[in-house]
Amino acid sequence: MKTYHFPVVVELDEDGVYIVSCPVFKGCHAFGSTIDEALDSLREVIEMCIEEQSLENVNQFIGVREMEVTIPISA
């Protein structure tokens, strides 16, 4: 058995549902009413992604950055 570590993005939508994704795999998303529930679901999705894809052909995760965007406000 081998253990891997993958980056995970956690978001909270307008309905209070946690959406989690692993940017290393395309389409690797899950959701839940708690973060733990969402992460448990994502773990299963990641396992399926590993079974279907070679780990050599996955996206290389670089990082997450915050970006400032200024928009004009009309009077």
Predicted regions, residues:
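Short aromatic-glycine-(Arg/Gly/Cys) micro-motifs in beta-strand/loop hairpins
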Residues: 10-22
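Short, charged, surface-exposed hinge/linker loops at domain edges
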Residues: 1-6, 40-75
